[in-house]
A protein has these predicted regions:
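Conserved beta-strand termini and adjacent loop/short-helix elements that scaffold enzyme active sites
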Residues: 1-6, 15, 82, 150
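Nucleotide phosphate-binding/pyrophosphate-handling subdomain across enzymes
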Residues: 18, 28-146, 168
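A short, compositionally biased
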Residues: 16-23
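Short, ordered loop/turn segments at secondary-structure junctions
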Residues: 5, 125, 152-154
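Redox- and metal-dependent alpha/beta enzyme cores, enriched for Fe-S-associated oxidoreductases
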Residues: 149-164
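Residue-level detector of flexible, active-site-proximal loop/helix-junction positions
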Residues: 7, 19, 86, 154
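Short, intrinsically disordered, charge-balanced linker/junction segments flanking boundaries
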Residues: 171-175
């Protein structure tokens, strides 16, 4: 099962942004449907469409699916909006702990809020894959406007050493 072409069981046709919600237009077995969602990012919309397909193939009626799919909330810590500041900035939480996950999260936020600046608060855990630290710093440097490094459970490593490994790829003016 895949999303993206007319020959798929399910095909994402359009995502229409309306304030903080999205209207998701899709086809299932070549018939058009739509529903509303408050989830952030195309990755979560794709997951919703796969949930629609799984429910449908399990025998649940499409009307029942459409009535309920928009009620799905984000998983705690996965592209979860946890606040809004006075200046209308959004605070979005995600537990991205690999370079690929961090890049996916940032690109999904940029898709949804293309005119917004992105400030990132993150760190890397200690006693874990040290090679990912500069990679994550590089991703943050490329895709974020401001970076705030923090400690993320350094375990038995020196927190400053971890931060320095991340900072190697970050321009000074960004953090």
């Amino acid at each position: 099962y895949k999303i993206g072409n007319e020959n798929s069981f399910i095909n994402l046709k359009k995502i229409q942004k309306i304030n903080d919600k999205k209207r998701i237009h899709f086809s299932l077995l070549k018939k058009d449907y739509s529903f509303n969602s408050f989830l952030i990012g195309s990755i979560q919309i794709k997951n919703l469409l796969f949930a629609v397909l799984a429910a449908y193939l399990s025998g649940i009626k499409i009307d029942t699916i459409l009535r309920n799919i928009g009620k799905i909330k984000p998983i705690n810590g996965r592209l979860e909006q946890i606040g809004k500041l006075k200046n209308k900035s959004r605070v979005i939480l995600d537990y991205a702990h690999t370079p690929d996950a961090l890049k996916t999260v940032i690109s999904n936020i940029k898709e949804d809020y293309p005119l917004s600046k992105i400030s990132l608060v993150f760190g890397c855990g200690g006693d874990r894959d040290k090679s990912k630290r500069p990679l994550m710093g590089d991703i943050a440097n490329k895709y974020c406007d401001k970076i705030y490094l923090t400690d993320d459970n350094p375990r038995f490593e020196n927190p400053k050493v971890i931060r320095d490994q991340i900072k190697r790829k970050i321009k000074k003016k960004k953090y």
